[in-house]
Amino acid sequence: MSDSVELYTDGACKGNPGPGGWGVLLIYKGVEKELWGGERETTNNRMELMAAIQGLMALKRECEVVLTTDSQYVMKGINEWMVNWKKRGWKTAAKEPVKNADLWQQLDEQVNRHKVTWKWVRGHIGHPGNERADQLANRGVDEVRAKR
C-alpha cells in the first residue's frame, strides 16, 4: 500500500436540524480533488460523518489515508465509542440506539477498506485544508438551499 492520500473533511448545517452540506478536499501526489454535497433536512453531525464517508468512498483502491477533521464527534466516535457500540449491537451504554448508526456503519465499512490515520484540527483557525473543506461544505448547503 504505497498510495498515500490526504483527506480534509467538514460538515455544515444552517439550523440544527436544517439544510446541511459536507465537503472534502482530497490530495493525492499533489493533485487536488474537491467533493461536496448536501441534504435539505439534516444535522451538523450527520454532515460531518457524511464528509468522511464520501471522502473514503471516492478512493477506488486500498490506500493509506490521513483523514483530518475538526469534528470531536467523529474523532471520539471512531476512536473511542464505536468498538463498544458494535459489541452492544449499536446501542449506547444506556442501551439506547446509537444516533446516526446508519452513517457510523457506513463509515466503519469504508474505514475497513483502507489504512486510516485520524487527525483532529480546531476548526476556523486558518488551517488550509480544513478551511477548504469548510468552504466546500458551505457550497453544499448553498446548493441545497438554491434547489428549494
UniProtKB/Swiss-Prot annotation:
Record's subcellular location: Cytoplasm
Region (Disordered): 129-148
Swiss-Prot/TrEMBL GO biological process terms: DNA replication, removal of RNA primer
Name of the protein this chain belongs to: Ribonuclease H
Catalysed reactions listed for this entry: Endonucleolytic cleavage to 5'-phosphomonoester
Domain RNase H type-1: 1-142
InterPro entries given in the database record: RNase_H, RNaseH-like_sf, RNaseH_domain, RNaseH_sf, RNaseHI
Organism: Pseudomonas putida (strain W619)
Keyword field: Cytoplasm, Endonuclease, Hydrolase, Magnesium, Metal-binding, Nuclease
CDD domains given in the database record: RNase_HI_prokaryote_like
Molecular function as annotated in GO: magnesium ion binding; nucleic acid binding; RNA-DNA hybrid ribonuclease activity
UniProt lineage: Bacteria, Pseudomonadati, Pseudomonadota, Gammaproteobacteria, Pseudomonadales
Cited function: Endonuclease that specifically degrades the RNA of RNA-DNA hybrids.
The UniProt record lists the keyword Nuclease: yes
Record: residues binding Mg(2+) 2: 10, 134
E.C. number: 3.1.26.4
Cofactor: Mg(2+)
Cofactor remark from the record: Binds 1 Mg(2+) ion per subunit. May bind a second metal ion at a regulatory site, or after substrate binding.
Top-level EC class as recorded in UniProt: hydrolase
GO cellular component: cytoplasm
Keyword Mitochondrion: no
Oligomeric and partner information: Monomer.
Family statement drawn from the similarity comment of this UniProt entry: Belongs to the RNase H family.
Residues engaged in binding Mg(2+) 1: 10, 48, 70
